[in-house]
């Protein structure tokens, strides 16, 4: 899955979760509210994971470039 798709998926989970949470609050359905909070938190976790993956990819690519430059010299 591409970085953009991962970010989109995480935002979708956050938004859907928030909607379920609000629905649960309005209707008094505590289970639905909890389900929404959980989904929203999962979306936030996915977002942080996608950020970490991007950072690691950047560091690895930078290290590869440095190694390639050294081998070219």
Swiss-Prot record:
InterPro entries: CsbD, YjbJ_sf. Residues 1-35, 44-73 have a biased composition (Basic and acidic residues). It comes from the Bacteria. Residues 1-73 are annotated as: Disordered. Pfam families: CsbD. Disulfide bonds: none annotated. Belongs to the UPF0337 (CsbD) family. This is UPF0337 protein lp_1708. It comes from Lactiplantibacillus plantarum (strain ATCC BAA-793 / NCIMB 8826 / WCFS1).
